[in-house]
UniProtKB/Swiss-Prot annotation:
Keywords: Cell membrane, Hydrolase, Membrane, Metal-binding, Metalloprotease, Protease, Transmembrane, Transmembrane helix, Zinc. The lineage of its organism: Bacteria, Bacillati, Bacillota, Bacilli, Lactobacillales. The chain crosses the membrane at residues 14-34, 39-59, 158-178, 195-215. It comes from the Bacteria. This is Protease HtpX homolog. One of its GO terms (cellular component) is plasma membrane. It is found in: Cell membrane. It comes from Streptococcus agalactiae serotype III (strain NEM316). Its cofactor is Zn(2+). It is a multi-pass membrane protein. GO terms for molecular function: metalloendopeptidase activity; zinc ion binding. Belongs to the peptidase M48B family.
Amino acid sequence: MLYQQIASNKRKTVVLLIVFFCLLAAIGAAVGYLVLGSYQFGLVLALIIGVIYAVSMIFQSTNVVMSMNNAREVTEDEAPNYFHIVEDMAMVAQIPMPRVFIVEDDSLNAFATGSKPENAAVAATTGLLAVMNREELEGVIGHEVSHIRNYDIRISTIAVALASAVTLISSIGSRMLFYGGGRRRDDDREDGGNILVLIFSILSLILAPLAASLVQLAISRQREYLADASSVELTRNPQGMISALEKLDRSEPMGHPVDDASAALYINDPTKKEGLKSLFYTHPPIADRIERLRHM
């Protein structure tokens, strides 16, 4: 059951990434048709922008992410229990030992970052380290180490980059169209008006950014389910992970502001959105995550 869930989540993520590139191609073709006079040129340009954006974000320094989240690196002497759990989970996962960080915050949370296992790092809040027992902490760290092993950080970064590229291209295309940079009316008469293509292009311009955001959220949620399942694979203790999630669910929001890109990295959404904003959670509901673990 565990390996079936892991395989299913991986397949769903691949499908979502394909959908993402289709959205990028659609918005590029739309801008090309409406503004540049060539949908082929717009399509190719959009894909190039998306790839460049993704590659540049992947190679951002781990230190930058840690600095943005007010995390400080600790040694084995400063936090021996925490350090040894990270070491144990990394050994079981067969990845290099990540760097270990602490965030001074009373909320219960943790995250991992790094484009590959060789330059990865794990961070946990002081609140998490104070409240969790060893089994629960192993579940949380196993979750973060699984993100590293499964290259989730890289996938999430690509998703953020592609969503940003779609929004950027849509914004530029809309402005150019609004300020008169669109196709000449003569062009439309020459090709018979092609009303359906025109309507599709305009709808793509409007709806693609929203669709990209929803796909990004779906990818993030699938990776959280996968990391939960992978953590249980490492610890062989589903109850430890379930107990940790129950405590995370009762946690208060982070005490310092967290930007949207960083929020997606945490094991528990640090902003604790409510109402309509919860529809745009980067994380699946904790109740759903617990339910999945109970059915393993």
